[in-house]
From Swiss-Prot:
NCBIfam families: gatB, PRK05477.1-2, PRK05477.1-3, PRK05477.1-4. Allows the formation of correctly charged Asn-tRNA(Asn) or Gln-tRNA(Gln) through the transamidation of misacylated Asp-tRNA(Asn) or Glu-tRNA(Gln) in organisms which lack either or both of asparaginyl-tRNA or glutaminyl-tRNA synthetases. The reaction takes place in the presence of glutamine and ATP through an activated phospho-Asp-tRNA(Asn) or phospho-Glu-tRNA(Gln). The keyword Metal-binding does not apply. It comes from the Bacteria. Signal peptide: none annotated. It comes from Nocardia farcinica (strain IFM 10152). This is Aspartyl/glutamyl-tRNA(Asn/Gln) amidotransferase subunit B. It holds the Pfam family GatB_N. It catalyses: L-glutamyl-tRNA(Gln) + L-glutamine + ATP + H2O = L-glutaminyl-tRNA(Gln) + L-glutamate + ADP + phosphate + H(+); L-aspartyl-tRNA(Asn) + L-glutamine + ATP + H2O = L-asparaginyl-tRNA(Asn) + L-glutamate + ADP + phosphate + 2 H(+). InterPro entries: Asn/Gln-tRNA_amidoTrfase_suB/E (IPR017959), Asn/Gln-tRNA_Trfase_suB/E_cat (IPR006075), Asn/Gln_amidotransferase (IPR018027), Asn/Gln_tRNA_amidoTrase-B-like (IPR003789), GatB (IPR004413), GatB_Yqey_C_2 (IPR023168), Gln-tRNA_amidoTrfase_suB_CS (IPR017958), Gln_synth/guanido_kin_cat_dom (IPR014746). GO terms for biological process: glutaminyl-tRNAGln biosynthesis via transamidation; translation. Keywords: ATP-binding, Ligase, Nucleotide-binding, Protein biosynthesis. The lineage of its organism: Bacteria, Bacillati, Actinomycetota, Actinomycetes, Mycobacteriales. Its EC number is 6.3.5.-. One of its GO terms (molecular function) is glutaminyl-tRNA synthase (glutamine-hydrolyzing) activity.
Length: 503
């Protein structure tokens, strides 16, 4: 394992940005949502039993030959176009040579000096609404590696493990690696810029439909390169690469930590080691991994078993026409249509609820009601289950139906939550649940009047207070009636009946 600089006390962040200019470089690996692998016909299903989605090609057995997945090339071109890149008229695959157990061929088929897309940019919106442009150096295609599973250690890492197992299901899955040019000028906002960039890129890729971008499952993996140079200097410092940061929040935390750590090393007279570093989610720190290789170490050469990729101008223009409205422009348009604040819109986006709310509105629900259900109640249900919001077993159409049941006073808002819970439990459509469970609102005034009289008779002191003009005391009676009707009454109507009975 590479040895890093001695542990030192972290420098205060304000001192870091006063003395040093951070330089970032973001490398994002994206697994494409294709049915089969990059160079063979094996499926790409996540979570399959280990080593059940393999063949001679992705295992690198002698005599096997790769065939390019056209859908992966199409996705790569669309990503490049969405990132404002130039699409190469002549792209070539190359062999990246290195030995590691999760790489069965001892080389990875990637792209080197002739990538599919180059020289683009992505404008990202920061927390205060300002826009920061991140320049893209390249986007290139490659195949993913297998997965090492380290057994017997406390951390799940190789250090301390008794042995390692290898799962080659992931080997050969299509990847796009998107590499930025050095990101300068962010100053103290560098960690925020890093997080905002990955967020914007994730949203863009999802809108394109090329990946599910689930960081927790590894379909979007981020490496953050960080270096520091003294304020006013022009020569970049030595960089480190923090590998596989697997959440948006962690991207920001990892960059901030590495800036503080490097500044402390430099201030103590030490030197930064060019190395990879592991990010620890538990405490937000990084630790040394291995010395960082250079391109020469990989001994790239053209892949002899694959022809170059030469997309025609006509095909590129056809794909350009499929690029949807940018997510951030769409959000701004919808925010204006809804007339909500930046804060409300951030809550919607952070909850992953925007598309779900739009679909619920399209199904007939008012925007405010749709937003309330997805951002509040259903977000909590997703957290309880440990799933993403769009993985809950309820559709926008079903949420819209619940809203309509409340609007028509078939159920009240409290009972509506019970209806949603039954839908989440797989017990049927909302209206059918109301019918089967007897959850319809008690709307018969005579039945409600009887319950009001019972509650008043049981609480004569409160009845006297109401008659004396202390109408706020009616809340106790309303609560008793709601309890007696299992929450299935209209609380506003019950209150009217209570006040009328005491007048």
């Amino acid at each position: 394992m590479a040895m890093s600089a001695p542990t030192v006390e972290l420098m205060d962040y304000a001192d870091v940005v006063a003395r040093y200019e951070p330089v970032l470089g973001m490398e994002v690996h994206v697994e494409l949502s294709t049915a089969t692998k990059m160079f063979c016909g094996c499926p790409t299903d996540f979570g399959a039993e280990p080593n059940t989605q393999v063949c001679p090609v992705c295992l690198g057995l002698p005599g096997s030959l790769p065939v390019v997945n056209e859908k992966a090339v199409e996705s790569a071109i669309r990503i490049g176009l969405a990132l404002n890149c130039s699409i190469t008229p002549w792209g070539r695959f190359a062999r990246k040579n290195y030995f590691y157990p999760d790489q069965p061929k001892n080389y990875q088929i990637s792209q080197y000096d002739e990538p599919i897309a180059t020289d683009g940019h992505l404008d990202v919106v920061l927390d205060d609404g300002s826009v920061f442009r991140v320049d893209i150096e390249r986007a290139h295609m490659e195949e993913d590696t297998g997965k090492s599973v380290h057994v017997g250690g406390a951390t799940g890492r190789i250090h301390g493990a008794s042995h390692s197992l290898l799962d080659y299901n992931r080997a050969g899955v299509p990847l796009i690696e998107i590499v930025t040019k050095p990101i300068t000028g962010a100053g103290e906002r560098a960690p925020e810029v890093a997080r905002a960039y990955v967020t914007a890129l994730r949203d863009l890729l999802k809108s394109l439909g090329v990946s599910d971008v689930k960081m927790e499952q590894g379909s979007l993996r981020c490496d953050a390169n960080v270096s520091l140079m003294p304020v006013g200097a022009s020569e970049f410092g030595t960089r480190t690469e923090t590998k596989n940061v697997n959440s948006l929040k962690s991207v920001e935390v990892a960059v901030r930590y590495e800036m503080r750590r490097q500044a402390a090393v430099l201030a103590a007279g030490g030197a930064i080691v060019q190395e990879t570093r592991h990010f620890h989610e538990s405490d937000g720190t990084t630790s040394p991994g291995r010395r960082k290789e250079t391109a020469e170490d990989y001994r790239y050469f053209p892949e002899p078993d694959l022809e170059p990729i030469a997309p025609s101008p006509e095909w590129i223009e056809e794909l350009r026409a499929t690029i949807p409205e940018y997510p951030w422009l769409r959000r701004a348009r919808i925010q204006q249509e809804w007339g909500v604040s930046d804060e409300v819109m951030r809550d919607v986006v952070n909850a992953g609820a925007l598309d779900l709310i739009i679909a619920t509105v399209e199904a007939g629900a008012p925007a405010n009601e749709a937003r309330s259900w997805w951002v509040a109640y259903l977000s909590e249900k997703a957290k309880e289950r440990g799933v993403a919001l769009d993985e809950l077993p309820i559709t926008p159409a079903q949420v819209a139906e619940v809203v309509k049941l409340v609007e028509s006073k078939t159920v009240n808002s409290k009972v509506a939550k019970q209806v949603v819970d039954f839908v989440l439990a797989g017990e049927g459509e909302p209206a059918a649940v109301v019918e089967a469970k007897g959850l319809g609102m008690v709307s018969d005034d005579s039945a409600l009047q009887a319950e009001v009289e019972k509650a008043l008779a049981a609480n004569p002191d409160i009845a006297d207070k109401i008659r004396a003009g202390k109408v706020q005391a009616a809340g106790k009676i309303v609560g008793d009636v709601m309890k007696a009707t299992r929450g299935q009454a209209d609380a506003a109507r019950v209150r009217e009946l209570v006040l009328a009975a005491c007048s």
